[in-house]
Amino acid sequence: MITKDSIETAYSFLHQKRNVYIHSTLDWQKDDIELAIGSYVDDMSQELYEAISDGRADFLRDHKRFGDDITQAVERLEKII
């Protein structure tokens, strides 16, 4: 079962990191954000991850798609809050 707290926590964390990521011009900062998000999703509720990932195992873990993924994750979480 996905709890309201887990949704709100994920939303807050991902929303904050996305805002920094999309405005950052520093590659090292973007890489650090990707690592932090990767670590976060490894530990988050599997059920919640599946709900926002559309079944993609590499969601929020693929460097080439990360910018799009983080935006989609925040949008999907906004819809279920």
Residue ranges and their predicted role:
Residues 8-11, 34-38, 67, 71-74, ...:
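Generic structural concept
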Residues 26-67:
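Acidic, low-complexity, intrinsically disordered interaction modules
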Residues 16, 20, 39, 43-47, ...:
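Amphipathic alpha-helical interaction surfaces
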Residues 1-3, 31, 68, 80-81:
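Intrinsic low-complexity, intrinsically disordered segments enriched in polar/basic residues
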Residues 2-32:
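N-terminal acidic leader/helix
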Residues 17, 55-81:
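Amphipathic alpha-helical binding modules
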